[in-house]
Amino acid sequence: MNDSNVEAPDKATFEQRFCSRAWNEEGKKVAQIDARHPGDIGLWDYDYWIQGQDYVHLSFRNVRVVSIENHQTARVKLILHNGEDVPLELKMVKEQGLWRIDDLTDAANPLGIRATQAQYIRENP
């Protein structure tokens, strides 16, 4: 288990460093749509990385790779704790020899963050 009492890292910096190109391109489109509606909450009313609005006492456990396909994609499951236990699944892709997060599935987004973002982009041309 890892614990952190520090502030949440900047989301954009985190995603640029650890997420796939496709994830980041989609995230930029979502940010552009949200910027057209100042004062509105936008697509995300919580931080999916910490599974809440506030960074309490973040930890994770039971991190396990459940599948690897063609040495290019993998699925990872873990339990995130930020006030309560939340099961998460990450889809990983290999880009330029490094594993990057390509999607995150949680209870609010059973089809994944990327599917939710893609729908939001389609609905807000």
Regions flagged by a language model, labelled:
Residues M1-N5, P9:
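Short, aromatic-enriched amphipathic alpha-helices that serve as compact interaction elements
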Residues E15-E84:
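Surface-exposed, charged secondary-structure patches
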Residues R36-H37, S67-E89, E95-Q96, D103-P125:
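Low-complexity, intrinsically disordered terminal/linker segments enriched in charged
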Residues D47, D102-D103:
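Acidic side chains
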